[in-house]
């Protein structure tokens, strides 16, 4: 109870400073879900690569960048005979990237997270989502060779990817990275990408077993994206022995008079089962957002159509659906049933503060056992950007199982506090 009072008070203190003034509409590309907004809070800064004409200066002009992060994450469990759990971790990233010579350069980055035992639960009270069940995690998460020529780029090795069904999802201590072969090409505002993903690691991949395979023979993928006033994404994934997936989203950001921005999107995902994997679905959705004077109001909807004994697969990462929350995504209930999600959110930005509140209603029809699903998640995110380097984020989430009389693993309160420094 004492911990709950402290965390609630901290959220209240941060939120009271948010409503002091107003801010102009931002015309940067809008993010598409609650999860994406939380994900983007602490992305490590990218440093510009130097170009040189000799090998010696490839090393002399190399760039070092990194991130120091500490995080507390605790769950108050409502389910009977399930202990509350919590952990506090310290870690970060350290990256070394060579200067470019004749189009070639290379980079490596270590990601690490270690629980601080004196503020971390033991045994069944331990929260393993920050640093694994062992309380410690270190990986050579990036190690690649890169070649670029004008608007064409090739990269081989462990790298960051952010595509609809494979993304970094930097939402806890360890973000996802991928062992892959990729090629990208830019032409008149269109960005083309193709490649093969062999394995991945990170918070979504299971910290206890890093570098999990992405299909029997990896994942082959290709896509095109465009973002200006109009937005477009069209992607195809062959996740070998699992599913063939076709993804599309498109929409518009239209700035009206009186500082009002309208952001409207639609999306479609079709997955075909391979090798009796059980992954096959059709998902369609829509998003409408209005932004004015630093305030935003949005509503998103997704519908998943599944045959008996099949489920949806949102990919390797946080997922691309408009209704993805901090924790809950449509996959969680779209198994052996049709399901839909409706999410409404309210955001406000003022000076160095950002506020976000979201309410998600997830419902699943009767499955083959005649059981329905109905889960509510509420998220509150409060962010303070002191400058480009230092960030403080407070996230409070709550899930409630509305279908079952007894408390389940979807009944809990979660508080997370992160301090992040980029260098």
Predicted ranges, named:
Residues 11, 16-158, 184-186, 258, ...:
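Beta-barrel outer-membrane channel/assembly domains of diderm bacteria
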Residues 227-229, 251-365:
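Detector for outer-membrane/organellar transmembrane beta-barrel domains
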Residues 68-72, 108-112, 156-158, 194-198, ...:
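Transmembrane beta-barrel strands of outer-membrane/channel proteins
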Residues 78-82, 128-131, 166-169, 208-212, ...:
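Extracellular loop and loop/strand-boundary signature of outer-membrane beta-barrel proteins
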